[in-house]
């Protein structure tokens, strides 16, 4: 899976984090931005804990097989806003565009289906699907996810080194896990 176009904005910005922490403008902005970047990365994208793209971004997923007629493949990152292009490597050695694909959801998972998939040629990954994933703009990201990002960034800012209480390492606040639990993909 490859991110072709990263999000144009983040769900929570530096001003929001600064306000959450009640800090003055300019105060430790470099460290704050680092904490915010880590917190967003914790939840966003293919490597994020949720298995979701938060703000619209373009991804390409490649597959080792091409389904038969009427078959489908699962896109591993949601929510899928649109399927932008599907290509199949042909026996002639070129990439053919699949027309009229259908996007459907089943059990919170996104699938792409086509009535007639082209016959693939020899290629380790003969099927490429480019799609846009994310809730929309930063304002469209569910508020519990945004709040979890704020809490996690604040935790990183305040606990600048591993915290040990009575010989045990302190963990990230449990409330963060509760905020994002309804949004987690089943396979994460």
Residue ranges of model-derived segments:
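Divalent metal-cofactor coordination and adjacent catalytic microenvironments
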Residues: 1-188
